[in-house]
Amino acid sequence: MPTIQQLIRSERYNTKKKTKSPALKSCPQRRGVCTRVYTTTPKKPNSALRKVARVRLTSGFEVTAYIPGIGHNLQEHSVVMIRGGRVKDLPGVRYHIIRGTLDTAGVKDRRQGRSKYGAKRPKD
C-alpha cells in the first residue's frame, strides 16, 4: 500500500488492456484477400491437417486465419471476411474465416449448427 505522500507524488495509472485481435482494429469483422491457402499441423497431443489461409486485410495487416468446416472453395485472390477467435492448437492463428460470405461458400450437407457455417436450411 502506498502512502498518501507517494500517491501525491505520482498518481495510480490504469493498465492498458492488450487486444487479442489487433488486426480487426476494434471492428467485429474485416474483409481481406487470400494470399496463400494451405494446410498445417497442430501442436503436440493432436494430429491433423488443419486448413488455414494467409489473408491481407483492408486494415493493412496480413494474418493467418482458420477455415472452419469440412471442405472449402478458397484459393489465392479469394475475397473473404474474417472474425476474431483463435484456434487453440495452431500457434499464431487468431482469426476465423466466416463461411457463406463473399467468395467463401457455406459447408455442403450441414444439418446442425448451420448458422456458424453459412449453410442454408435443407429442403426435407
Curated annotation (Swiss-Prot):
Care to name a GO molecular-function term for this sequence? structural constituent of ribosome
Region feature Disordered, mapped onto this chain = 103-124
Q: Where is the composition biased (Basic residues)?
A: 113-124
Q: Which residues form a coiled coil?
A: none
Q: Hey, which family's this protein in?
A: Belongs to the universal ribosomal protein uS12 family.
Cited HAMAP family: Ribosomal_uS12_B
Indicate what this protein is called per its UniProt record. Small ribosomal subunit protein uS12
